[in-house]
């Protein structure tokens, strides 16, 4: 070949080499920083702009090309001085021995070196660190395969000279530095167009086709085509060559020479047929991938719940064997798997919507795609701080009968999952709230609040807080919550009841079928957790006082939360925010404004109304699709994702962790898949039964009998299936008392706030689903006035508890608990904050039992920390993880009384409870009685006494021992004990029934004139070992005041009487003798006679009473008694036949025409008498023509007005008009017969009418005959009783016609003969006929229509009507009289008689109800009302006037009196009890105190001011001082003593530690980083090398 042609070919080959993948424009990245130049001195960067230093430790591995200000550059091959190339340690390319740079198109593996010079050293080390670098010569430039550096180092670049930037042209060759153009005769043909590789189907076989465009030329050309593929080592392997005159080539995809998954290339060169050795440069095609591609939407995702699609496509057609079954669809099935990189125990962090996809056969390929499908993937929300992780999605080997497809494994892809924080919020006990970001504050307010609201999705939690029994300070506790996620709404509530009595109930108000919700119980129901599909959960730790809540926020809510739990953005400073998310101004009480901001108005919370939520669209379920389920730990070993494999599609599994390290019992089905969606927790179900539930789950795996363990059954319990038992015991408390709470809300709610009242007991039925949907109740705390109460608690407490003793108890209870000791490394400072909460709880409530409430927080926090980080740091924590898991499963390690199983404690015989701490052999302990043991028989049913304590067990043998105490002389003596019925509520509360005569007053003993009944109570679980005794006092609140404020005794009230052992309030009358009354000022022990009794008073009578002869005269006397006594009427004198009823109704049948005098006597119950005489005038009855007189009801009785009732044929006011006159010849052809005021007609025989009565609503047929023709006429008669008449003329020629009209009441029946129409009679048919007859002198005006006289009504006038009508439910009687209901009198029952004497200006509304004036209440308005109520035991004497006990004064007895007065600003809290100002203590508060106390020998020199010894500082002298600052993360733990990390040592932690040690004189310059001497390298400098320097 001539030299010129050779040069041309080489030049064209350079072009081909430049087409390597890394040489292509998208195959590499650029490093353009001018600082990388070897000539750039980086000293000034270190002095002024450290952030601009070149540090390639975070450089992504890949191919790079260097540019300096857009000028081509390459790595230098000579040693570069330190502090050049924009960095401290520049990296250059070292060519050792005979190494050279790669020639064009070649790639070489070379070594790069970093230059470094140690401090105080005079020589530099050009190759202190070595990094492998691959170099590819792309012709005009070079690219480098670079790796990230170990530290802050930088790769150098050197600009290419101008001479090298302008090589000779493609048709030129370099000769002596000059470019000489070649001769035209030796030029090769122009190259072909870039080939393209495609797959096509030819006769059921797959072929790769390489085709290209042919350049235009004058000569005949041929083509040389070469096939190659890229090996797994990224090296091209030639497959075959072909010389052809066709512009394409075919190569079969046979699975042997060419397989699926190959990356295929073809190249084509052109040659002249006349001169075959002259060829063009070979042009290579783009890479063609034959097989399946997995193309993710994003390769880097976050744990934020978002979903992404994965496109799976095939670049080759899907074909099926001709021998395959005809009914099978032609497809290729792929099974997907996910493999997480890194340590196996991290668990999976990627989930797929399906582990199985199908690629179906298509008719053709388009845009390089022959078939495709989709599957969704998402990050697993694992609630772990596992950092950013990478997972592979791989495809299992394809199983197919076609050799081409069988065992083909498509390339996997990598998905990087970025970790997103999750957080927990705690609201415990008082409650103390710890926000998502860790800020701690107290919310002592009551009401309903927004606890947690997501701005990124439909999720919200409302919490209710009630007053929880602090005797001295206004504190609150959680009593329930409602949580909503989308369409799922769950309520867990115990607010509708009284403190320590109410039981929590849980129900699902709404459910979204597209989501999964889970409800679980742990520790025998002490923990209840609601899990939502997003991963959020709400856990309630139950107590008799309410519940503590733990809320978990998933990563999807990061930076998207509002409410009392804060903003969840890892910045606690902005947790106090308003409803718009804006931070509330910083001030001393900004938390108060923050709490008020999130308080919900009454009736607006989800507890009161069902929120409107849009049903979320259906989302795909996800599977783990893990590679090997056995390779991952089970749920007990902290795996957060289920390992079940779904064959076709994912159904129920989630991409969110819903597992717990604390053993749990899934009880979801009890609330979702049952007719009743509510079950009361811990009510009527003992812990033993819950334990039985757990055992039932494990019975098929564990033989508990062989272990000698107690399955905790009792006689009677094993008869029922435990779960069925729970299902049958579904009650709720509060429904039955709803109406009472609405009526007596003020008094009822004070029962919750005042511990000293005895709460009522009610029985409540089960609730239906309809009840649950409408279940709302009145929550008084929502309506209470929001008043910020400042209080200053101080030590010691009123009961004498000191701060030191309380702190010791809290530390022992919490820090020394099993969870506190074993999980200390994880709890850290959280343990200290929980101990502080414990101390504050005891201080505020003065009750040591609250010390245990914080253990639940430690359990939840420990579980959280282990889930977040513990299981990923097994090297650091060692075997302590296993110990912690054991104590989470088995609290207190089963107290040494049982064996720890996977599901919890299996207690030994005679022990029970979730931690086996309760012993059956141990007698229970009574701590107190309901309402401190006092019960007022006037207010409550004292038959049942609520007993609070510890160790109660629901056993058939549980019983109460009740002993009546008899007062003998000066002491109480016990009587015979009685064993009574016991109602078990839970392990801390039972009800004891007292004997049936407990409320009979004759059972009370007079103690100095004070009637009191005392009973001693004991409780036993087994009937043998009884608890300590407690005394309950039954008293009559009408006469006595009992309670704590009366020094545990009772005192008799003023203004009461004690008569015959019974108690009466002043003004009470003798039940059998109304004239005897209680007058304590006259006699407290006998009845007093009702003095100054006034006689009854008759109300004003009518001026004149009249009646008429023959009237049944009735008149009602009305009177009242000033004292409210009953009145009795008697007739003293009057006419014969007259009488008066005891109620005052006078009756007389008037049979005389003379005026009569009547005398009536009125007597009250005390025989006071009043006489009244009335005169009645009798008028005559002036009705004529036999008419009779009746009373006119339009006038009141006694007016004497009457009406006349006339006989037929007469009318007029006095019946004076005769209406019986006849018309001329009224009978026509018949003969006229006259009668008394009437007439009749005697018809000829031929016109006589046969009358037959028929039933009502029949058809009346009249047959008329004329000219031998019969005509039938039918008519309906529905208004009267029909008659069927047959008029039978004797002659067929007769024609009937009436000359004169018959009138409206008659009809023509024969020639000139009219007869009465049906329903009418009389000579002129003027009298209508009514059947039945009209009563009470009613008049028949139309057939069967009566016109009634005044005072009567109805169809036949048989109903009495009174005018005016009777009032107040009175019944009308004959004679326009009213009979009145109880409590009303008068002619129209218009006067009410009040049976109660309404006092203090009250008015009688109904006979038994008084309407009181403001400030008074009670049945007779005798009790004054003080608002606000009298405090500190004060009694309400008059409206808003309190009578204070000794030691208190003020309008509401709110001020205490201390003598001597409190010093130094101390506050008088109650009688002679001072509360010290902060910083002082002592009897006179003369001592200053430091709280917390000074540490490390510091002295308290002022309130909370410490004087620290040398070497210590800080407010508490708790901060050590190191004069020489600790370096490299060391911590100053004592004066001038540093605690160093494991990789540093020395006084100031300034000396690094290399393990293993550096060899051959190497020096340790960083932890585990050696600086080797010249000619040595390696991690430990263990390798000896030769360095060639240039």
From Swiss-Prot:
Protein name: von Willebrand factor D and EGF domain-containing protein
Sites carrying sugar chains: 367, 703, 968
Gene: VWDE
GO function term, MF aspect, one: signaling receptor binding
Subcellular location: Secreted
Keyword Membrane: no
PANTHER family in the record: EGF-LIKE-DOMAIN, MULTIPLE 7, 8, VON WILLEBRAND FACTOR D AND EGF DOMAIN-CONTAINING PROTEIN
Entry keywords, A to Z: Disulfide bond, EGF-like domain, Glycoprotein, Repeat, Secreted, Signal
UniProt superkingdom: Eukaryota
């Amino acid at each position: 070949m001539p030299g010129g042609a050779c040069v041309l070919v080489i030049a064209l080959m350079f072009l081909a080499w430049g087409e390597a993948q890394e040489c292509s424009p998208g195959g590499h990245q650029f490093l353009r920083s001018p600082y990388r130049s070897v000539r750039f001195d980086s000293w000034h960067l270190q002095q002024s702009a450290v952030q601009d230093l070149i540090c390639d430790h975070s450089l992504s591995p890949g191919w790079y090309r260097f540019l300096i200000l857009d000028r081509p550059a390459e790595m230098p091959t000579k040693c570069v001085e330190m502090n050049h190339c924009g960095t401290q340690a520049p990296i250059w390319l070292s060519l050792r021995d005979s190494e050279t740079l790669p020639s064009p198109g070649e790639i070489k593996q070379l070594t790069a070196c970093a230059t470094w010079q140690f401090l105080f050293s005079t020589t530099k080390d050009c190759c202190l660190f070595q990094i492998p670098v691959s170099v590819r010569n792309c012709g005009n430039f070079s690219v480098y395969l670079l790796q990230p550096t170990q530290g802050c180092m930088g790769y150098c670049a050197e600009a290419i000279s101008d001479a090298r930037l302008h090589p000779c042209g493609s048709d030129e060759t370099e000769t002596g530095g000059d470019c000489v153009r070649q001769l035209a005769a030796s030029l090769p043909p122009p190259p072909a167009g870039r080939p393209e590789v495609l797959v096509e189907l030819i006769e059921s076989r797959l072929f790769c086709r390489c085709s290209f465009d042919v350049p235009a030329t004058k000569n005949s050309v041929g083509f040389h085509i070469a096939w190659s593929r890229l090996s797994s080592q990224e090296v091209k392997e030639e497959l075959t060559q072909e010389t052809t005159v066709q512009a394409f080539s075919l190569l079969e995809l046979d699975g042997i020479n060419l397989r699926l998954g190959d990356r295929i290339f073809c190249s084509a060169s052109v040659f002249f047929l006349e001169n075959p050795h002259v060829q063009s440069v070979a042009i290579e095609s783009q890479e063609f991938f034959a097989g399946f591609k997995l193309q993710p939407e994003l390769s880097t995702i976050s744990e934020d719940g978002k979903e992404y699609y994965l496109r799976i496509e095939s670049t080759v057609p899907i074909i099926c064997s001709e021998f395959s079954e005809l009914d099978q669809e032609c497809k290729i099935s792929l099974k997907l798997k996910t493999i997480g990189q890194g340590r196996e125990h991290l668990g999976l962090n990627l989930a797929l919507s399906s582990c199985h996809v199908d690629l179906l056969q298509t008719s053709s390929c388009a845009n390089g795609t022959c078939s495709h499908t989709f599957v969704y993937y998402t990050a697993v929300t694992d609630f772990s701080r596992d950092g950013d992780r990478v997972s592979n999605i791989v495809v299992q080997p394809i199983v197919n009968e076609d050799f081409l497809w069988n065992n083909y494994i498509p390339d996997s892809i990598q998905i990087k999952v970025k970790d997103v924080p999750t957080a927990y919020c705690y609201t415990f006990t008082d409650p103390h709230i710890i926000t998502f970001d860790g800020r701690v504050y107290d919310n002592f307010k009551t009401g309903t609040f927004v606890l947690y609201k997501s701005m990124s999705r439909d999720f919200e939690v409302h919490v209710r807080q009630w007053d929880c029994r602090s005797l001295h300070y206004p504190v609150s506790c959680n009593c329930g919550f409602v949580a909503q996620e989308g369409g799922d709404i769950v309520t867990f509530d115990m607010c509708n009841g009284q403190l320590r009595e109410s039981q929590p109930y849980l129900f699902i108000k709404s459910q979204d079928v597209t989501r999964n919700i889970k409800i679980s119980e742990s520790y025998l129901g002490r923990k209840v957790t609601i899990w939502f599909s997003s991963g959020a959960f709400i856990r309630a730790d139950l107590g008799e006082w309410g519940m503590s809540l733990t809320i978990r926020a998933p990563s999807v809510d990061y930076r998207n939360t509002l409410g009392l739990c804060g903003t969840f953005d890892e910045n606690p400073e902005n947790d106090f925010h308003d409803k718009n998310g804006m931070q509330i101004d910083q001030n001393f009480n900004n938390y108060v404004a923050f709490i008020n901001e999130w308080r919900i108005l009454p009736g607006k919370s989800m507890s009161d109304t069902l929120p409107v939520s849009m049903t979320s669209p259906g989302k795909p379920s996800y599977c783990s699709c893990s590679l090997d389920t056995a390779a991952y730990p089970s749920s007990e070993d902290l795996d957060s994702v289920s390992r079940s494999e779904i064959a076709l599609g994912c159904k129920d599994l989630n991409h969110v962790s819903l597992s717990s390290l604390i053993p749990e019992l899934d009880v979801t089905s009890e609330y979702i898949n049952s007719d009743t969606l509510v079950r009361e927790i811990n009510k009527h179900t003992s812990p033993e039964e819950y334990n039985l539930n757990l055992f039932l789950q494990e019975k098929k795996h564990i033989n508990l009998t062989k272990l000698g363990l107690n399955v905790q059954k009792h006689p009677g319990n094993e008869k029922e299936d435990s779960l069925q038992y729970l299902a049958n015991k579904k009650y709720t408390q509060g429904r039955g008392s709803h109406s009472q709470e609405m009526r007596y809300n003020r008094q009822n709610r004070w029962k919750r706030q005042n511990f000293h009242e005895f709460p009522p007991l009610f029985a409540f039925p089960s609730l239906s689903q309809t009840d649950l949907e409408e279940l709302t109740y009145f929550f008084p705390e929502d309506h209470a006035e929001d008043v910020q109460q400042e209080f200053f608690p101080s030590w010691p407490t009123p009961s004498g508890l000191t701060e030191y003793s309380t702190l010791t108890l809290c530390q022992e209870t919490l820090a020394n608990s099993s969870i506190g000791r074993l999980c200390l490394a994880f709890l850290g400072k959280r343990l200290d904050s929980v101990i502080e909460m414990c101390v504050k709880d005891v201080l505020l409530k003065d009750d040591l039992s609250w010390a245990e409430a914080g253990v639940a927080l430690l359990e939840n926090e420990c579980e959280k920390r282990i889930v977040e980080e513990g299981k990923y740091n097994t090297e650091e924590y060692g075997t302590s993880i296993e110990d912690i898991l054991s104590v989470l499963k088995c609290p207190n390690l089963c107290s040494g009384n049982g064996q720890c199983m996977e599901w919890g404690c299996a207690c030994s015989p005679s022990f029970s409870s979730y931690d086996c701490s309760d012993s059956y052999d141990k007698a229970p302990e009574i701590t107190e009685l309901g309402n401190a043991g006092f019960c007022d028989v006037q207010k409550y049913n004292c038959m049942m006494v609520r007993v609070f304590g510890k160790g109660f067990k629901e056993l058939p043998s549980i019983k109460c021992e009740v002993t009546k105490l008899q007062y003998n002389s000066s002491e109480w003596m016990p009587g015979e004990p009685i064993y009574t019925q016991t109602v078990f509520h839970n392990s801390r509360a039972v009800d004891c029934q007292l004997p049936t005569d407990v409320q009979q007053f004759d059972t009370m003993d007079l103690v100095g004139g004070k009637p009191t009944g005392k009973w001693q109570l004991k409780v036993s679980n087994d009937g043998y070992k009884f608890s300590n005794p407690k005394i309950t006092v039954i008293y009559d609140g009408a006469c006595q005041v009992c309670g704590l404020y009366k020094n545990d005794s009772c005192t008799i009230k003023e203004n009461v009487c004690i008569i015959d052992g019974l108690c009466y309030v002043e003004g009470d009358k003798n039940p059998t003798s109304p004239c005897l009354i209680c007058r304590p000022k006259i006699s407290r022990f006998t009845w007093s006679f009702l003095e100054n009794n006034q006689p009854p008073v008759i109300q004003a009578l009518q001026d004149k009473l009249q009646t008429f002869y023959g009237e049944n005269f009735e008149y009602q006397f009305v009177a009242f008694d000033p004292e409210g006594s009953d009145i009795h009427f008697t007739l003293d004198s009057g006419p014969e036949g007259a009488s008066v009823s005891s109620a005052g109704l006078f009756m007389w049948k008037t049979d005389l025409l003379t005026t009569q005098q009547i005398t009536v006597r009125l007597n009250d119950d005390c025989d006071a008498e009043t006489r009244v005489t009335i005169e009645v005038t009798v008028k005559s009855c002036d009705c004529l023509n036999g008419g009779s007189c009746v009373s006119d009801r339009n006038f009141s009785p006694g007016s004497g007005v009457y009406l006349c009732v006339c006989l037929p044929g007469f009318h007029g006011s006095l019946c004076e008009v005769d209406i019986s006159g006849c018309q001329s010849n009224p009978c026509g052809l018949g003969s006229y017969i006259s009668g008394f005021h009437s007439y009749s007609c005697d018809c000829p025989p031929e016109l006589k009418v046969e009358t037959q009565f028929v039933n009502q609503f029949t058809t009346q047929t009249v047959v008329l005959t004329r000219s031998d023709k019969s005509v039938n006429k039918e008519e309906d008669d529905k208004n009267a009783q029909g008659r069927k008449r047959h008029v039978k003329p004797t002659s067929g020629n007769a024609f009937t016609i009436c000359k004169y009209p018959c009138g409206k009441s008659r009809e023509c029946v024969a020639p000139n003969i009219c007869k009465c129409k049906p329903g009418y009679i009389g000579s002129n048919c003027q009298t209508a006929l009514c059947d039945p007859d009209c009563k009470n002198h009613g008049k028949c005006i139309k057939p069967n229509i009566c016109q009634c006289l005044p005072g009567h009504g109805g169809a036949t006038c048989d109903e009495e009507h009174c005018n005016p009508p009777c009032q107040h439910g009175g019944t009308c009687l004959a004679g326009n009289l009213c009979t009145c209901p109880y409590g009303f009198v008068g002619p129209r029952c218009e006067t009410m008689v009040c049976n109660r004497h309404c006092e203090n200006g009250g008015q009688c509304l109904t006979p038994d109800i008084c309407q009181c004036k403001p400030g008074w209440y009670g049945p007779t308005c005798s009790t004054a009302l003080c608002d606000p109520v009298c405090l500190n035991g004060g009694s309400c004497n008059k409206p808003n006037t309190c009578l204070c006990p000794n030691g208190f004064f003020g309008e509401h007895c709110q001020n205490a009196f201390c003598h001597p007065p409190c010093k130094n600003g101390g506050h008088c809290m109650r009688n002679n009890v001072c509360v010290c100002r902060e910083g002082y203590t002592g009897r006179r508060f003369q001592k200053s105190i430091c709280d917390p106390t000074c540490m490390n020998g510091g002295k308290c020199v002022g309130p909370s001011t410490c004087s620290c010894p040398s070497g210590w500082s800080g407010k508490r002298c708790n901060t050590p001082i190191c004069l020489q600052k600790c370096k490299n993360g060391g911590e100053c733990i004592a004066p001038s003593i540093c605690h160093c990390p494991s990789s540093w040592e020395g006084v100031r932690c300034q000396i690094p530690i290399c393990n293993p040690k550096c060899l051959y004189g190497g020096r340790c310059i960083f932890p585990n980083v050696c600086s080797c001497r010249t000619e040595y390298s390696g991690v430990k400098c263990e390798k000896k090398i030769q360095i060639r320097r240039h």
